[in-house]
Amino acid sequence: NKTILKALIDAGADVNAKDDRGRTALMRACLLGQDRCVEVLLDAGAKINDQDEVGRSALMEACIAFKRDTIHLLLERNADVNLFDNNGVTALMRAAYGGYPSLVEKLLAYGADKDMTDKQGRVALDYVREHNRAQLEPILR
């Protein structure tokens, strides 16, 4: 709830505090698509590109959950589209894996590098092929 969140911040809550897995309130809000809370947290100084213990960022969490509005909000606030997790997986690879053409196109428009490789040497196009997402092949070629 936006009102409660603002009250906590006004009372001195650390917007960049992390849980036992290194996740921040911003990451959780993005995973849940709580855009008003995302805005409040960012306005209060939440670090948009923080990563948890497995290397996931707020943008990656939003991509995993396919929260379109949240993704757009993060991109407009200059989230790094080319961050990668501990396995080298990027937001673009997650979008490709999920089979989300509009998300793949949006990430590319915001500068996602389709040639980045994960730790296994795979690029986003490999995720498309491995998971039978043929509709994405023309976008990523």
Summary of predicted features, one role per range:
Residues 1, 28-34, 61-67, 94-100, ...:
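Ankyrin repeat A-helix N-terminal signature
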Residues 53-56, 60-72:
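Alpha-helical adaptor scaffolds
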Residues 108, 113-141:
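Leucine-rich solenoid repeat scaffolds
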